[in-house]
A protein has these predicted regions:
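Cytoplasmic helix-loop-helix junction between adjacent transmembrane helices
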Residues: 100-137
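Residue-level signature of mid-helix packing/kink "hotspots" within the transmembrane helices
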Residues: 21, 49-57, 109, 142-143, ...
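C-terminal transmembrane helical hairpin of 12-TM major facilitator-type secondary transporters
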Residues: 266-308
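Extracytoplasmic gate region of multi-pass secondary transporters
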Residues: 23-27, 202-251
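Helix-to-loop junctions at the C-terminal end of transmembrane segments
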Residues: 55-67, 253-265
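Cytoplasmic membrane-interface "Motif A"-like loop-to-helix N-cap segments
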Residues: 65-76, 262-274
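C-terminal ends and interior cores of transmembrane alpha-helices
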Residues: 77-91, 276-288
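Helix-loop-helix hairpin linking two adjacent transmembrane segments in secondary transporters
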Residues: 133-177
Length: 308
């Protein structure tokens, strides 16, 4: 293995997920200023996620054709330029917010870079743990949920894009200096070889399982700030804290899931996860839907003044 590369992959993944998810914690404040309705706000939040899903194919292809490190550097530069333009030029319309979301999709595609970069250094029996450690970088969503709404309240949500550039530039330099491609990487395949994977029935099943698990995680994480604001009347900062707690739990369990998959197999681990997740979501659906049912002091402390 190569611990510095594993660390670089985690850091790159962590900060990439922070900015990929950035529009979620800022959604309430952006929607208020741009006068967006609920549907527009939802699409704005979903755009980086959808773009990231598609761009993972491109980034995965670049990993094979160039190298994971080169692909990671290119993706980071694109995101940094997009955030710099959003900070300096500003986001003044719904369409501009969607355009920013498209470019932030490159941050979401970091998944296709960080995992191969880290796992290719390790033998098969340890790849689950390596990918779990690198994959724990989705904790970057916790950073966005914790700090983005507060920074927006202090300096304006447009300036949050500028604040995000500081850790991103530090990560870019660290990644360039520390990360190394594995000496025995798989050779690049022809385009037809990629298409053959689509003929494998198991591939479709695993893509479906992944869309439910990780798609559910990032989808809920992006929607929770708006949900807490709409359903419970929480202000954006408090909604960010609540969301961060939910996201942190998922990020904390990811390395444990990788280690468990190494011991008992991926299928059994997925079955356990689906069972537990289904029970938790069912219990969550039984909770009070209105903050009015909470004790008075809690309701007054976290209330968010609504526009009439």
């Amino acid at each position: 293995g190569h611990a510095p590369t594993l660390f670089a992959a985690f850091l790159y993944f962590d900060l990439s997920f922070m900015v990929w998810y950035l529009l979620g914690p800022l959604a309430v404040q952006i929607a208020t200023d741009l006068e967006l309705n609920a549907q527009q706000r939802g699409l704005m939040v979903a755009t980086p996620i959808l773009a990231g899903a598609v761009l993972r194919l491109l980034m995965g292809f670049l990993c094979d054709r160039l190298s994971p490190k080169t692909a990671g550097l290119l993706g980071q530069v694109v995101v940094i330029i997009a955030l710099f333009c959003a900070w300096q030029i500003g986001i003044g319309s719904y369409e501009q917010a969607l355009l920013l979301g498209l470019f932030l999709g490159f941050a979401g595609a970091a998944f296709a870079v960080a995992l191969p970069l880290a796992s290719q250094w390790y033998p098969p029996q340890h790849q689950g743990k390596a990918m779990g450690i690198a994959g724990a970088g989705n904790s970057g969503t916790v950073l966005a949920a914790l700090f983005a709404p507060g920074l927006a309240a202090l300096s304006g949500w447009q300036n949050v894009f500028g604040w995000a550039l500081i850790p991103l530039l530090a990560t870019l330099v660290t990644f360039a200096l520390v990360a190394r491609n594995a000496p025995e990487r798989p050779k690049a395949k022809a385009l037809g070889d990629y298409l053959k994977a689509l003929g494998d029935r198991d591939s479709w099943w695993f893509m479906f399982f992944y869309s439910v698990t990780f798609g559910g995680f990032i989808g809920l994480a992006s929607a929770l700030p708006g949900y807490f604001s709409d359903q419970y009347g929480l202000n954006p900062v408090t909604a960010g804290y609540y969301t961060a707690a939910c996201v942190f739990a998922g990020s904390l369990l990811r390395p444990l899931g990788g280690a468990l998959a190494d011991r008992i197999g991926g299928i059994r681990t997925l079955l356990m996860m689906y069972t537990i997740a289904s029970l938790c979501i069912a219990c969550g659906g039984l909770q009070p839907a209105q903050l009015d049912r909470c004790p008075g002091p809690v309701r007054r402390r976290h209330a968010w003044p609504r526009r009439r």
